[in-house]
Amino acid sequence: TRAAVWKTIDQLRQEGYGIDAAPKRGYTLASVPDRLDTALVRAHLSGHPWQTLVTAVPSVDSTNNACKRLAAEGAPDGTAILTGCQTAGRGRRGRTFVSPPGGLYFSVILRPHAKPEALMHLTAMAAVAAARAVFAVSGVYPDIKWTNDLVLGGKKLCGILTEIGIEAESREVDYAVVGIGINCARVDLPPEVSAMSASLEAFTGQKPDRARLAAALVRSLCELEQALFTGKDAWLREFAAHCITIGQDVKLVRGDDVTYAHADGIDEEAALLVTYPDGTKAAVASGEVSVRGMYGYA
């Protein structure tokens, strides 16, 4: 009945859907709410093998922590958790990862059959996957700061944290969790954070559809897994082409020790190739050091 249709339309409007009414023509969907809803994300993944493995939650301590708990319980390859609110987001070496409201915080479980040393390039490939997803939704392909940040306008848009669990007997990888946090909305942040932070809304002038962005991440990360061992060279070439660290003079930070070098490129495992002032060359693994530009964050 008309009354039942109107009641449904009214309910959808209350939930944030933009619905236009036209006399004698009915209703049209003008916009969907900017919220991270499991059904909305899955709707963008029709027919995808990971569609039913993706779950959005209102809030979580850390999406990486959530996926690690699920992985320990036997959750399958492709299981993903996403949210707009992390209460205890983590970065590399246990640092706090600032998770402003309006962002997208996403982690996925991968089950590669490999030794840990065979996954040294995983974070670099994850950076490419995240950049491709951002491009698919916004039309902007971010720069990459070696090895785990995406950058817009010299400021951090996205951070990536990869963690692995090891089987005790075989010493092979039981699971890998890839965590990606993207600043989507323009929000007020403390000055010391704001000076280094970018958002898609601030850069493009439009808020991204986070459900679409989450679905794009799922697709990109599934493609990553398929290319992890047999197609990595093309992914690493893409990484190098967009890596703003390459060609820069950089600071290499190992705890309290700071050294200076010139970043020449990356090798086949995504280690940073550097030349020190005395002419010595080396390959620096991402787990060993943090890299800072000489003249700012990037």
List each model region and its residues.
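N-terminal lobe of the biotin/lipoate ligase/transferase fold
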Residues: 1-136, 156-158
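Catalytic beta-strand/loop module used to bind and position nucleotide/cofactor moieties
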Residues: 77, 83-85, 93-103, 107-298
